[in-house]
Amino acid sequence: EKVVRYDFHKYSIENWSKGGISCKTFYETGRFAGILKRIRKNDYVIIALQHNDKKPDVGEKVADYKHYLTYFTQHIQRKGGKVIFMTTPPKNYADRKTFKIYVPEYRNAMLQVAKDLKCNYIDLSKLSTDYFNFRGKNYVNTLYMKLNPGQYPAWEQGINDDTHFQRDGAKVLARIIAVDLQANRQIPMLN
């Protein structure tokens, strides 16, 4: 998968994510090396790896997860970059009426690495879980890829995806992130 680039007035954003990737596979596939080649002093790197790190086929144990996060951060900082960690939103399980933080042990590990390495973070796990519980299941179902047959041509049979978001869901998450970034005055680019 390619890197997606967005250019705004004085900012350029590159999205190096890839579906199904964990910290380990992000490193092993060379995606992290690609980021390191492009980093310049004072660049920000948002690390949001968590959802796939528990999967047995691509993931790793919590200790290994912390190792990769630490490795990534130290190498980014050596190049003059700044890391912002971001925990991931909850899953939307059909059999649950409320939302819970997904893989809390990995969330806690990420927050611990952020604290240990004095990095900023966005706790999207907590922020989105709280917001989703406030708004309720019916509303939140419209944000995830829970599509009826025929609703979209690409998914003629429908889809019941409890992890990924539709465009409206992505916009809600972007608003939650933007509000948190604006409230977090420790990040100089936002002052």
Q: Which residues does each predicted region cover?
A:
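Extended interaction regions within the primary functional domain
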Residues: V3, F8-S12, T25-T29, I84, ...
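Short, solvent-exposed coil/turn linker segments
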Residues: D7, I21-S22, D123
